[in-house]
Amino acid sequence: MRIAEIVGKVTLGRVHPTLQGAQLKLAVPLTLEHLRGEKDPLDDEFLVVYDPFSTGVGEQIALSEGGEAAQPFYPELKPVDAYNAAILDSVHLRDQ
């Protein structure tokens, strides 16, 4: 599981039948450098995330990927690579 930030919405012209009515968001996974403000998140990779929570742009989420991203739908199968598992209220970093 990773921390990511929602940076936009995804709109599809055609959609797989199992994703009808789903909200898809564009997210950027955050590294420690991003969380400390040392690096701009928009310089890195973007992911399309299945979002069941209507998360807004700028919010941070807990992101599951791969096989774990499809587990909330079991036994139904959905073509999902990334899933918003939680909206994060805050993230606190400790210096070590």
Language-model features, listed with the residues they occupy:
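Short aromatic-glycine-enriched beta-strand elements
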Residues: 18-27
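Short, structured beta-strand/loop micro-motifs enriched in basic residues and often containing a Trp
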Residues: 39-47
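C-terminal structural segments of small proteins and small subunits
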Residues: 62-96
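Short, surface-exposed secondary-structure boundary micro-motifs
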Residues: 9, 30, 66-67
